[in-house]
Amino acid sequence: MAKGKFERTKPHVNVGTIGHVDHGKTTLTAAITTVLTQKFGGEAKAYDQIDAAPEEKARGITINTAHVEYETANRHYAHVDCPGHADYVKNMITGAAQMDGAILVCSAADGPMPQTREHILLARQVGVPYIIVFLNKCDMVDDAELLELVEMEVRELLSKYDFPGDETPIIKGSAKLALEGDKGELGEVAIMNLADALDTYIPTPERAVDGAFLMPVEDVFSISGRGTVVTGRVERGVVKVGEEIEIVGIKPTVKTTCTGVEMFRKLLDQGQAGDNVGILLRGTKREDVERGQVLAKPGSINPHTHFTAEVYVLSKDEGGRHTPFFNNYRPQFYFRTTDVTGSIELPKDKEMVMPGDNVSITVKLINPIAMEEGLRFAIREGGRTVGAGVVAKILE
């Protein structure tokens, strides 16, 4: 079957469902696609199609994730749903599916549960900027006061992790009723309310090309008579010939000028997000630039060595370590294109970290890396991946 052409007319937003096991994340995902495809076209996905999430690999880690898409009047959404709790942890930490916003599904019959809390914490740590709540299974709760109580608990939990609990949209409904075609307040109406909240509460994300220029250095060549060429894929922004750029990371930051941009052996006047380019630098020696540094718009990103991070440690079955690690463990941290050694400090109450755990850590690198909160990395030992992480907070 031919794939339908992707019409890029509406702005695109990435979202996903999070929340405790059996609170109805997958049922809600199916209900959203069912209701919205009837209204705005597209392809509905049944519960079992979503539940049989295919395996994918991100940073050497196998994750089960289901991807669905749907449209509202104003936007095109890509939505991820994970079958198991471990998949969520891995997904959010590796950034396999970057979310511009999350739909927290919480059963009105049960209230917030351990994974509800853990997913909110993870969302905070990995930088998911917005959360909308769908209070599910409201058809099973007759007591209005109980509903109010659950709503209050969820708001308090969000506020505890620095989300604006009081302003967060909370939609009451029943994914099951909506999926069965119920047109009432808790059925289809609730799904439309949710779609409306997605459209209005989650801002349209900045496109990569609109960000400040950043390109991780992959390779460096010296071309006689022309100077030094640095190759890589532009991560965000635009670089124009004649602009000043900084070389950041590993060594002290230096300023240089872009004197040429090449792509497929053709000269261009600029390179932009997504392009694989060679950038010619004026007056820069080949030994001044190395893999692992970045080229960036001056002042837009700084080098750091000390940060806190949320990490997932691979289990033995995933090819990770067979034994736990302890405080002051010194692996390599793979940022963008290179490894840097660093030491790990565990939280006070944590004596050791077992394969398969996720944990908050503090890291000190031996060399600075151009870094921002939300930057992903792999943890490696002698070239093999033993974990994945995301920078939560920069300390220095």
From Swiss-Prot:
Residues 10-206 form the tr-type G domain. Residues 136-139 are annotated as: G4. Residues 174-176 are annotated as: G5. It holds the Pfam family GTP_EFTU_D2. Residues 19-26 are annotated as: G1. It catalyses: GTP + H2O = GDP + phosphate + H(+). Keywords: Cytoplasm, Elongation factor, GTP-binding, Hydrolase, Magnesium, Metal-binding, Nucleotide-binding, Protein biosynthesis. It is found in: Cytoplasm. Residues 60-64 are annotated as: G2. Mg(2+) binds at residue 26. GTP hydrolase that promotes the GTP-dependent binding of aminoacyl-tRNA to the A-site of ribosomes during protein biosynthesis. Belongs to the TRAFAC class translation factor GTPase superfamily. Classic translation factor GTPase family. EF-Tu/EF-1A subfamily. This is Elongation factor Tu. The gene is tuf1.
